[in-house]
């Protein structure tokens, strides 16, 4: 899409005990394929843990949803989702510009 996105990894909801499974090397093959596929489009900090990269690339996202809206509407959308019972709601990033076509992970 040729836009630059800042992704705030600490804001991404993660299912309980996932890190424990990743640490035990219980990782779906599709996840590693995902990570390999997106590697040219994603910039991670030099010290970013490999386990966190794997979690962000997880292929087990059945039901996962990402919505991109103008910043002006984020609070309203989050509040509306919460009132509708969508509890794992979080603003996890921002579209910065039409630059590199990259996702920059923080």
Task: Label the predicted regions.
Residues 1-106:
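Glycine-/charge-enriched secondary-structure boundary and capping motifs
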